Amino acid sequence: TEKFNGGYESWDSNRDKWCRSRNTFCKKYPRSQYNAAIHNIESIACYDYKAKIDSNVHRLHSVITNIQKDYRHFLLYDEQPLVGIDIANSQPYLLCLLFNPIFWEKDSNTTLNIGTLPTNIQSLFSQEHFVEIRDYVSSLTAEALQEYKQIASEGRVYDHIMSLINSRRNTTLDKKNVKTMMLIVFFSKNRYYHQQGATLKRLFDNTYPEIYSLIALAKRDNHAALACLLQSIESEIILHRCCKRIWKESNHQVPVFTIHDSIATTTEHVEWVKGIMQEELTNAIGIPPTLKEEQWNLSQVGHPQYLY
């Protein structure tokens, strides 16, 4: 591809990355990126997939999750192309589970509640905090949540909020701006609110005040708690429900590869895998998701003129 043909210097196109520990943008080093790409490609060639579930949010990491997106289009399974099945607007969609008061009760009889998640995730919240969140959610009306749940189910959260804010505020936000806004809303500290950079966070609060209040309440004692909770919910559903069921019902014959909120499989199995994902996500979250397919093949590669 263009980056490999151009050597180290061509890798500087992805030069800036947000560094949480330094609270600023840091340079990405082309040499490190180049070496990482080569390392991942060689690992796949050697069948060393480096699969490991982390002990923090219990996501599965592998050479496939680590490799840059463009290079996934070169991957085949048994000479067959792969298709990724993604949850549209996954984090905003998974948030809908937290609107259910019963989720916050460890001993409830729901298929997925805080008590079914790993103990380190449960320990992010005190029992008093569980009760406080549950009581707050119980106080919300169905009308306050209805619109958000509808657009989350349809995978239109970013588009809807972009349109809503632009019409109300006479602004020109694009989808990238809105995705940034959602990252800030979900993962930044609550005290980061009145600063100039938190404008989009305030816009979300003004648009969905009840939902913003729930997010802020969940992050009150630990701003990382919500991110860890949502990613753990994602892992529970994708790995331990969808993939486990696929593996069992197919008698170990259907290949699956996960990239956090996405499952990839071969073309012939896409519809069947999508059906299982649809059922498991709907059962767990309470509303159906929108699933999108991404073809992994050379026609999707950036700068295809460098392939041959």
Label each residue range with its predicted role.
Residues 1-73, 78-80, 88, 287-308:
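Non-catalytic nucleic-acid-binding interfaces of large nucleic-acid enzymes and RNP effectors
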Residues 35-36, 43, 52, 199-244:
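Surface-exposed, low-hydrophobicity interaction/linker segments
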Residues 91-98, 267-276:
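A short acidic (Asp/Glu
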Residues 236-259:
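Active-site palm subdomain of RNA-directed nucleic acid polymerases
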Residues 86-87, 182, 255-266:
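Catalytic palm active-site di-aspartate
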Residues 64-223:
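Helical catalytic core of nucleic-acid polymerases
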Residues 189-200, 270-308:
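C-terminal polymerase-core module
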Residues 176, 180, 184, 236-240, ...:
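Feature representing long, continuous alpha-helical segments
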